[in-house]
């Protein structure tokens, strides 16, 4: 991935990201079963409105809701990318983007599914209009490294992680500039 000053839909599309569908449309999308990275984008750059509680599922009894002041502190003005995630193939090669994005969608719809990362997005009033895009990684490329590099690029542009990323990803190679 070539660094840029801003991660936009156009930049990401030029890099091979596709989809750009709301979570509700993921089931009808041709999402690859391969490993890769994905992003959640908010096309609207107006100030966010946060729900008082999250509609997401309570996996292992944990409430995914976050206080509004915590959400506001994590918000990145002018950024459209809200979350960067990864999907590994898994030990048996049965995971990948399709399965991981389905878990994320189901978690947001209230099911008790294990997708704790990125949970902040579900407290946005306009979460139904967020767009999801994905990009398979090459067979010799670790999706955790690709995720780490995208997050590092975002940090270089904005000084902080994307809104819903609470960690910097999983690097498997050397440091990212």
Please tell me what each predicted stretch does:
Residues 1-82, 86-177:
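Boundary/linker segments flanking structured domains
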């Amino acid at each position: 991935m070539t660094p840029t000053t801003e991660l936009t839909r156009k930049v990401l599309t030029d890099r091979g990201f596709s989809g750009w569908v709301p979570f509700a449309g993921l089931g009808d999308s041709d999402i690859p079963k391969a490993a890769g990275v994905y992003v959640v984008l908010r096309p609207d750059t107006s100030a966010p409105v946060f729900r008082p509680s999250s509609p997401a599922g309570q996996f292992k009894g944990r409430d995914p809701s976050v206080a509004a002041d915590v959400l506001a502190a994590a918000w990145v003005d002018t950024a459209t990318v809200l979350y960067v995630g990864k999907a590994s193939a898994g030990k048996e090669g049965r995971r990948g983007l399709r399965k991981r994005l389905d878990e994320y969608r189901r978690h947001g719809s209230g099911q008790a599914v294990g997708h704790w990362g990125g949970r902040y997005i579900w407290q946005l009033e306009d979460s139904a209009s967020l767009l999801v895009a994905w990009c398979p990684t090459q067979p010799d490329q670790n999706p955790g490294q690709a995720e780490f590099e995208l997050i590092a690029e975002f940090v270089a542009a904005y000084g902080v992680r994307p809104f819903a990323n609470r960690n910097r990803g999983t690097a498997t190679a050397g440091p990212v500039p």
